[in-house]
Regions:
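Short, ordered, surface-exposed loop/turn motifs in non-cytosolic proteins
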Residues: 37-53
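Extracytoplasmic beta-strand/coil segments of soluble accessory domains associated
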Residues: 135-174, 204-215
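Periplasmic plug
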Residues: 155-199, 225-236
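Short, acidic Ser/Thr/Gly-rich low-complexity loop/linker segments typical of extracellular
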Residues: 55-69
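N-terminal periplasmic accessory domains that precede
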Residues: 131, 143, 207-236
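Short, surface-exposed beta-strand/beta-hairpin micro-motifs centered on an aromatic residue
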Residues: 65-76, 183-184
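A short, solvent-exposed loop/turn motif at the edges and junctions
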Residues: 54-57, 78-108
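Extracellular beta-sheet/turn segments enriched in Thr/Pro/Gly and aliphatic residues
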Residues: 100-132, 212-218
Length: 237
């Protein structure tokens, strides 16, 4: 049910144990890629779960963008605990990777690299491009999406009408902060939108049905250095 997903979001993003050393000074950023030494091909639109050792519920769930990049920025974590990053395809855990705990506090504050190599068995989603016309220019983004797609909007979450698992929403290939979702969907007119990529998983998982990647007529998209030598997380499953 949809209320279960919304409750899951609240629990995973807001829960911090008073007995832990969790904070948001550190977070995992990474790229899912298919080459063992250099980033030559990112793996797009993977559902990625972050779990902490000893916890039954995942800490957070996200999706890689079209370049294979993902981030758990803002998720409270304890760097002195092991974490696991898992790839979910349909109803199965397709792969898991170990993020080793720190023994001593690092000298830096910020992101911790969590790149991993993953080769999908096959394409797990379909992709459609929506390009607005002149007649759509004055429509608000949310109204346009409701016109083109069978979806509903509840508590800052977009759901396909036929599913209880929502869409992950990107703007210019970057995650949208929760506090900006309402503003972007309900105040931005379609004349500011170049196109929308609609990704639908062939087999929706319990976290997401797919992705909406909104491309504005302005602004830059994030890039990934294709020459960067990558540290890869060890695969444990």
């Amino acid at each position: 049910m949809r209320f279960k997903f919304i409750l899951f979001l609240l629990l995973t993003l807001k829960s911090v144990s008073v007995f832990s050393q969790e904070n948001t000074d550190y977070w995992y950023d990474g790229v899912a890629y298919t080459d063992s030494t250099e980033l030559t091909s990112g793996v797009p639109y993977l559902t990625i779960v972050l779990s902490k050792e000893g916890d039954q519920m995942p800490k957070a769930v996200t999706v890689s963008n079209s370049l294979g990049a993902f981030s758990f920025y803002g998720v409270p974590m304890d760097i002195f605990k092991d974490y696991t990053i898992s790839v979910i395809e349909g109803n199965r855990n397709a792969a898991s990777y170990l993020c080793n705990k720190f023994i001593e506090k690092p000298s830096f504050v910020g992101n911790i690299n969590a790149h991993f190599k993953y080769i999908p068995i096959g394409k797990t989603y379909s992709e459609t491009i929506l390009t607005p016309t002149k007649e759509d220019a004055k429509l608000l983004l949310l109204d346009y999406l409701k016109k083109k797609l069978e979806l509903e909007y509840e508590d800052r979450v977009l759901f396909p009408k036929a599913s209880d698992a929502p869409y992950k929403v990107f703007a210019n290939n970057a995650e949208i902060p929760d506090e900006k979702i309402d503003m972007i969907l309900q105040q931005v007119p379609m004349e500011m939108i170049k196109q929308i990529t609609v990704v639908k998983y062939n087999t929706p998982n319990k976290y997401f049905s797919g992705v909406l990647n909104i491309r504005f007529t302005f602004g830059d998209e994030p890039t990934v250095d294709k020459e960067t030598r990558l540290f890869s997380l060890p695969r444990i499953k």
